[in-house]
């Protein structure tokens, strides 16, 4: 789908969704507004991440335009697909290149990608397995880049 059709207003997305049964969006704010509109009208829908835009944001607490993070936000970004397994592996590798001990191994927190665990369990898993790593000035999360998602919203029949 063309990029222009992914940047529609909420009303345009709503109309297109009703006409075609699906719409794509790269705007998180407009998607949220559309979700609320659909829920208020009791219209069932499904969402699926179909890709990422070229935009990225650094999570580093030490960059000039810091966004920062906490474990709750990190887990939320993992659950929403904005922070991928591949990105987290890249960040562990970067962290391990500049730090001798302790080593950050993705396998230690692999279960954060398990959809059956709740957010609190995932936060506790990271705390338990990366406790010493999280005490450092630089952590693997400081090397991460958040991706902006493109989502397909489909009406459920």
Swiss-Prot record:
Tree of life domain: Viruses
Family per record: Belongs to the mimivirus L242/L243 family.
Protein name: Uncharacterized protein L243
């Amino acid at each position: 789908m063309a990029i222009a059709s992914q940047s529609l207003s909420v009303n345009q997305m709503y109309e297109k969704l009703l006409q075609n049964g699906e719409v794509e969006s790269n705007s998180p704010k407009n998607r949220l507004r559309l979700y609320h509109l659909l829920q208020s009208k009791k219209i069932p829908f499904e969402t699926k991440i179909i890709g990422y835009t070229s935009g990225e944001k650094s999570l580093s607490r030490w960059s000039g335009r810091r966004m920062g993070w906490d474990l709750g936000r990190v887990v939320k970004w993992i659950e929403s697909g904005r922070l991928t397994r591949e990105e987290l592996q890249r960040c562990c590798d970067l962290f391990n290149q500049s730090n001798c001990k302790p080593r950050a191994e993705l396998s230690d927190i692999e279960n954060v990608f398990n959809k059956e665990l709740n957010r609190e369990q995932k936060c506790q898993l990271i705390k338990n397995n990366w406790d010493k790593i999280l005490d450092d000035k630089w952590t693997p999360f400081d090397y991460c880049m958040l991706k902006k998602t493109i989502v397909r919203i489909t009406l459920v029949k």
